[in-house]
């Protein structure tokens, strides 16, 4: 089954990985800490913590760092003052965007998020304005060159919902969010190490963009991801490999 290439998106993100690694790790640690605080430090009994750990491992975070974050969250600390908030809006070209945040000051966060939208030619919407366009699911992505038949057999047996092979040979394994970490663990045990793995909001219908609009949308996403309170940004933009290469 062919589809748009998530691998192109990953390559774009990897190009900025070194500069943003510290910020990415900060966000991952925050998610682990909050997940442990809300649901306890036992990952087997805490699906959210299990998913957070799986994502951290996929981003090459050390087990020691992960364990410290779990202990910190389960023990209770300043993270008790942090709350989760979600903002929805539209970017250039009418692209739908969801922004998940963790903050100890809602007024500060909404001001920063609104400013990013406004400066980039978008606008912050109301709750529910775009969320209906997305489905929450786990996506485990593999670079071109992986044994497609073997991966498909293991993934389906482990409970994957769908497997999509893209034109460039990259493969996405889709899972129910609750099964995400278990399926990823099975794949790792069988020797399939992913290039990216996350529980995300996946748009059912993608927005097709020209190069100019794609650059503006990417700039907005970068602005949002650079905000300290922002954990994740999701959009329905279809960043094809051709667009990624043109944007550079």
Curated annotation (Swiss-Prot):
It holds the Pfam family Transcrip_reg. GO terms for biological process: regulation of DNA-templated transcription. It comes from the Bacteria. One of its GO terms (cellular component) is cytosol. Keywords: Cytoplasm, DNA-binding, Transcription, Transcription regulation. The keyword NADP does not apply. Its main location: cytoplasm. GO terms for molecular function: DNA binding. It is found in: Cytoplasm. The keyword Metal-binding does not apply. Disulfide bonds: none annotated. Coiled coil: none annotated. Belongs to the TACO1 family. This is Probable transcriptional regulatory protein FTT_0655. It comes from Francisella tularensis subsp. tularensis (strain SCHU S4 / Schu 4). The lineage of its organism: Bacteria, Pseudomonadati, Pseudomonadota, Gammaproteobacteria, Thiotrichales.
